[in-house]
């Protein structure tokens, strides 16, 4: 019986050692599997897992959908890609741009996932045919953007691990 308890304890440590917390902002944290390769260039952080990779960037409203400067409407624009806002609030040309980008990205009602965790809106989609997906996390003042290339299991695991930070650093 002691052996089983010891084995369970050792295995539980191994599970915890398989990922690390990535603190994206004062409000957002997620568990990322251990990666042998982590690259950082400019505003992009890339994690490589064998044949899969995940990249993260903080969206710039001036650069996200170039040449349109989305400053002031960036969150509404991202929501509109997932058909969560009334596009009629946008000028006709911006509504058309939103619909075009949503279609280009391949966001459909069947492949999108939408969740609210605390003060975070988490919007994502995954295309199993191309084995790629994207996630947008709408934080209080930032929009985090993840791009996934790899299995739907990696996408689901990372998507489900996104959570609002309980401000453990601010106590």
How does the language model describe each region?
Residues 43-138:
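Conserved polar/disulfide-associated segments of primarily extracytoplasmic proteins
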Residues 12, 121-122, 144, 155:
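A general marker of short, structured functional hotspots
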Residues 21-23, 38-40, 45-47:
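Beta-strand-rich N-terminal accessory domains
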Residues 24-38, 140-171:
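Surface-exposed amphipathic alpha-helical segments
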Residues 3-14:
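Sec-dependent N-terminal signal peptides
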Residues 17-19:
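Boundary at the C-terminal end of the N-terminal hydrophobic targeting segment
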Residues 9, 38, 86-90, 94-101, ...:
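A broadly tuned preference for mixed-charge, low-complexity surface segments
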């Amino acid at each position: 019986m002691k052996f089983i308890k010891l084995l369970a304890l050792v295995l539980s440590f191994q599970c915890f050692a398989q990922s690390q917390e990535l603190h994206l902002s004062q409000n957002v944290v997620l568990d990322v599997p251990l990666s042998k390769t982590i690259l950082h260039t400019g505003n992009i952080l890339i994690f490589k897992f064998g044949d899969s990779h995940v990249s993260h960037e903080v969206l710039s409203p001036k650069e996200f959908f170039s040449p349109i400067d989305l400053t002031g409407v960036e969150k509404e624009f991202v929501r509109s890609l997932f058909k969560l806002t009334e596009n009629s609030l946008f000028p006709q040309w911006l509504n058309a741009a939103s619909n075009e980008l949503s279609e280009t990205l391949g966001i459909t009602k069947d492949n999108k996932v939408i969740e609210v965790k605390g003060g975070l809106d988490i919007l994502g989609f995954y295309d199993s045919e191309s084995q790629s997906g994207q996630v947008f996390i709408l934080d209080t003042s930032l929009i985090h953007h993840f791009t996934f290339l790899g299995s739907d299991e990696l996408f689901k695991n990372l998507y489900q691990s996104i959570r609002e930070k309980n401000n453990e650093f601010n106590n």
